[in-house]
Regions:
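Bacterial N-terminal signal peptides that target proteins for export
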Residues: 1-7
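N-terminal signal peptide c-region/cleavage motif recognized by signal peptidases
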Residues: 15-18
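A generic "folded-domain core" signal
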Residues: 20-185
C-alpha cells in the first residue's frame, strides 16, 4: 500500500525483525521492515488509511489516500479536523501528497501517542471508534470505518516493540538480509 514508506524503512534498517503474531480480522494488514512497521486498510469507497511508526520516534504518522482526491496540491499544508464517532474534532495540520502509489493522492499528519485533550488521547479515541470523520473548512472530506482498529494498533505496537528491541544488534543491512514481511490482522 504505502510502498515508499516500506522502502524507506528497509533502507534505514539495522536488523531484521519477526512480526508479532496477532489475531486476524482480515481488514488491516501489518507490514514490518527492520526499522519500523505499518498497518493499513482499504474502505469500500477506495479510501486507504495507513499508520506507521519507526522505532524510537515519538510519533505515529497517518496517511489517508483516495484516488478521487485530485484537488489537493502536492506539498501544500491543509488544516483539517479529525473526529471519532461524533466526538469533539481534533485539529490537524496535514500535508498533501499526490504521487505516492496506486492508492492515489493523500493527506499525511503525525500524532504523538500521548497527544491528549479532555482526558482521552487521539490514539485511544482512534482505537475505540467505529468511524473517523475528516473535514476541512466544515466540509466532509471522508468518513472511514475503523473496524478492527484495536487489533491493528496492538499489532503495530508489538511490531514496533520487536523492531526497537532488535535495533541494538549492530548488524548491517546486508548481514541481516533486510526484508519486509506482511501479515493480515
Amino acid at each position: 500500500m504505502f510502498k515508499s514508506v516500506l522502502v524507506l524503512l528497509a533502507a534505514a534498517a539495522a536488523s531484521s525483525v519477526a512480526i508479532a503474531q496477532t489475531p486476524s480480522t482480515g481488514r488491516w494488514k501489518l507490514e514490518a521492515a527492520p526499522s519500523g512497521c505499518v498497518v493499513h486498510a482499504a474502505s469500500p469507497s477506495g479510501t486507504v488509511v495507513s499508520i506507521w511508526g519507526i522505532a524510537g520516534q515519538d510519533s505515529l504518522s497517518f496517511l489517508v489516500q483516495n484516488k478521487a482526491w485530485n484537488s489537493f496540491a502536492d506539498g501544500q499544508r491543509y488544516d483539517i479536523h479529525i473526529s471519532f464517532d461524533e466526538k469533539k474534532p481534533w485539529p490537524m495540520r496535514a500535508v498533501a501528497r499526490r504521487n505516492i502509489d496506486k492508492d492515489g493522492p493523500g493527506l499525511t499528519f503525525a500524532v504523538s501517542p500521548n497527544h491528549a485533550a479532555g482526558g482521552a488521547s487521539f490514539i485511544d479515541q482512534f482505537a475505540a471508534a467505529g468511524g473517523m470523520n475528516i473535514t476541512r473548512n466544515g466540509q466532509r472530506i471522508e468518513t472511514v470505518s475503523l473496524d478492527g482498529t484495536q487489533v491493528a494498533l496492538r499489532g503495530l505496537a508489538q511490531c514496533l516493540s520487536q523492531v526497537w528491541a532488535a535495533s541494538g544488534s549492530g548488524e548491517s543491512e546486508a548481514e541481516s538480509g533486510a526484508s519486509v514481511a506482511a501479515e493480515t490482522i
